[in-house]
Amino acid sequence: MPCAAPYPDADREAVYRAIRERRDMRHFAGGQVEPAVLERLLRAAHHGPSVGFMQPWRFIRVSDPALRRRLHACVEAERLRTADVMGDGTAQQADGPAVQGAGRQAEFLRLKLEGILDAAELIAVALADGREGHVFGRRTMPHMDVASAGCAIENLWLAARAEGLGMGWVSIFDPADVARLLGLPPGAEPLALLCLGPVRDFYPEPMLERERWARRAPLASVVFEGAWGRSAPWLSAEEAEQENPAARRPEGATESDRKRGPAHREPEPGGARSDG
């Protein structure tokens, strides 16, 4: 029985390239996103898969500068609360020694975590109210509404990369505060603040990987055969590339581009930037 044909080679590679080069962007170049492009991106998001075809996502475009500032203040408040939690204990730095809590806290505060005030567009994503009525695929796993919305966000992310636009997912906020600011009805829940717009450059590797906050796990550590922890012998030599993710760089990037990269940390005198 004949099977469906794959995409032509160039089309197939374009899909995989968008996946490889997608980045969680924090640095934006201002400008604007044309309405037709924004609609195209949101249509791609709306074509995301959802459990039971529940389509739980709702998108709110935030165009009021004052509302943006209030949302930014929510993120900043939670950023500081998160830093306080990091002040205790130790954490393992990628490719480095364990970092004491105070050191990890300082590292966190120096990171730029969002571009709410800089991005051309700010899109809030919320889970719709009335989700309890959707039980298809959710009776034993009600959190599949979150998983479904995540699929829509990834669609938007990949489409944005294909359009040459950066996107960053911000989740450092108190949901109750954001729900109040956005006027969400009872039962609806904010899930993400998406910063979207033109960027000068895409990071040659994930920002947190470059900052040695964490690194991508080897594929063999997350793929099993038949049972948890049982290695998959069919994995190819790609595993060597997974072990050394810094060796990968976007098409057209030079080795000096990889080493230099964008300036990921932008502290103000006396401390971190107020926008993370």
Where are these regions (language model features)?
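C-terminal helix-cap and adjacent tail motif
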Residues: 2-7, 11, 193-276
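Small-aliphatic-rich amphipathic alpha-helix that forms the alpha element of a beta-alpha
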Residues: 45-46, 123, 131-181
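Short amphipathic alpha-helical segments
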Residues: 38-43
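Generic N-terminal amphipathic, Lys/Arg-enriched alpha-helix
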Residues: 14-31
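Glycine-rich phosphate/pyrophosphate-binding beta-alpha loops
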Residues: 47-52
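Extreme N-terminal tail/first-helix region
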Residues: 1-18, 105-109
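A glycine-rich helix N-cap at a beta->alpha junction
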Residues: 80-91, 184-206
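Glycine/small-residue-rich phosphate/adenosyl-binding loop
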Residues: 55-149
